[in-house]
Each structure stands twice: as structure tokens, then as C-alpha cells.
């Protein structure tokens, strides 16, 4: 299984290449109508009002978000080095659509750990897309506890556009399926996080979430419970789709 956590992809070599890649957009470019701006909120669970409870909903959600366990495996999988600090960590993403597989890099460029307006305890991180990604932009994932009510939310905030370097075939596919799949991804992230938190607090098994992640030599495949499948060799793989 060495070096092949994403089917037939040499993920060790692919991750090494990401070290030299830059973010593929300039913040000054981010403006409507050329870019999409999305905020997706979903309820994770509830605690008593006040600071996050030890071993409670907020802490469970924070740990799952930290490890990128909430990603829906039917749409996105990822490999990264657990030993790398969270800030600056590179992730190799595998985007999955039918028999197509897209391999792209992102980098975590910001961490959030704060209390806002004395009303919300927030923890999260932001990743930005790297050169040759299918998209351009950033996503911020946050776990938010409303201190007055005890409600815990998962918030995904995204600024994105299709990479202009994408070829004509992928451009056509994006026109029909890209935006729809993108929105489905964020909905599924919220659903999965809710299910995983509930499972972690009650001991209820969850498919593709009840097992430990596949890990060798510090390289982790997430979400937990997924592994390369023999049929992966029949998929159509696109490396660096935004080249």
C-alpha cells in the first residue's frame, strides 16, 4: 500500500511537489460577479450555555474539523502528513465525480481560535488553492459555539471561481456539474460532521467514520474508513487539472 493511498497515485511524490507551489490567485482579484461567495451553516449539536464543555459537542467537532474527517468520501478524499504543523500544512485532494478523479493541492494558511463579541467561541482554519488546482479561492471551516444558547454550528465560508486555465472539456463539464457538485459538497460536510459528532459522543458506528484513518510513515488518508479499491484502476485520472 506504500505511496498508493489514493489508488494508483504516488501521493508521496505528489505531496512533495506541492511544497514549491504558490497560491493560484491574488486576493485583489476576489470580487463579484466573477467569483462565487458562499456561507453554509449547519447545526452540529447543543451543549449547556457557556464555554465549551470538556469532551462535549464543540470539542468533538473541533477535533474532527482539525483532522479533515468531515469531508464526504464520495466527493473528496485527502492525504497529508500528520507531523506537519496545521498552519502551512499541504493537502493533496482527490476530487471524485463518477469515474473521474482530479488531483489538486491546497494549503492551510490561517488558523482561527477566538471568542467573538463575547458571544461565540470559534475554532477553525482556512485553506487556499495552489497552482494547477481546478478552482481558485479559499475555504474557511469553523466550529462555532453560541455561548448564550449552547448551540454548536459548523460554518463553511467560500470564495471561489473555476480556474481560467482549465481546458475546454473540463470547462464544459464544470458549466453543467461543477457548481452543483460544489454546493452538494458543503451540504454533505455539514451532514457528515453532525453524524460523526453524534457517533463519537454516543458510540454509534458511522460508515467511513468509525475506523482509524489509513496511515503509514506519518502520511494519513482521510476520512477514516476509506482505502484504495481494486476498481480504482479503471477510473480516469486528471492530474493538475488547472495547469
What is the meaning of each model-derived region?
Residues 170-216:
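A conserved amphipathic terminal alpha-helix motif
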Amino acid at each position: 500500500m506504500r505511496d498508493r493511498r489514493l489508488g494508483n497515485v504516488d501521493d508521496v511524490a505528489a505531496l512533495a511537489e506541492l511544497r514549491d507551489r504558490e497560491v493560484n490567485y491574488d486576493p485583489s482579484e476576489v470580487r463579484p460577479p466573477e467569483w462565487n461567495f458562499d456561507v453554509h451553516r449547519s447545526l452540529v449539536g447543543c451543549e449547556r450555555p457557556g464555554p465549551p464543555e470538556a469532551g462535549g459537542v464543540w470539542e468533538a467537532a473541533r477535533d474532527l474539523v482539525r483532522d479533515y474527517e468531515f469531508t464526504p468520501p464520495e466527493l473528496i478524499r485527502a492525504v497529508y502528513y500528520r507531523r506537519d504543523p496545521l498552519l502551512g500544512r499541504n493537502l493533496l485532494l482527490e476530487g471524485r465525480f463518477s469515474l473521474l478523479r482530479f488531483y489538486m493541492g491546497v494549503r492551510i494558511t490561517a488558523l482561527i481560535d477566538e471568542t467573538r463579541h463575547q458571544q461565540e467561541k470559534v475554532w477553525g482554519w482556512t485553506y487556499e488553492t495552489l497552482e494547477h488546482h481546478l478552482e481558485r479561492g479559499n475555504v474557511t471551516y469553523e466550529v462555532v459555539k453560541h455561548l448564550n444558547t449552547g448551540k454548536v454550528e459548523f460554518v463553511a465560508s467560500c470564495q471561489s471561481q473555476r480556474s481560467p486555465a482549465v481546458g475546454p472539456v473540463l470547462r464544459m463539464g464544470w458549466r453543467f456539474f461543477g457548481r452543483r457538485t460544489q454546493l452538494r459538497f458543503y451540504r454533505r460536510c455539514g451532514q457528515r460532521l453532525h453524524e460523526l459528532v453524534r457517533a463519537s459522543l454516543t458510540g454509534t458506528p458511522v460508515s467511513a467514520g468509525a475506523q482509524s484513518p489509513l496511515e503509514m510513515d506519518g502520511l494519513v488518508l482521510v476520512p477514516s474508513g476509506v482505502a484504495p479499491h481494486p476498481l480504482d484502476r479503471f477510473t480516469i485520472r486528471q492530474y493538475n487539472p488547472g495547469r
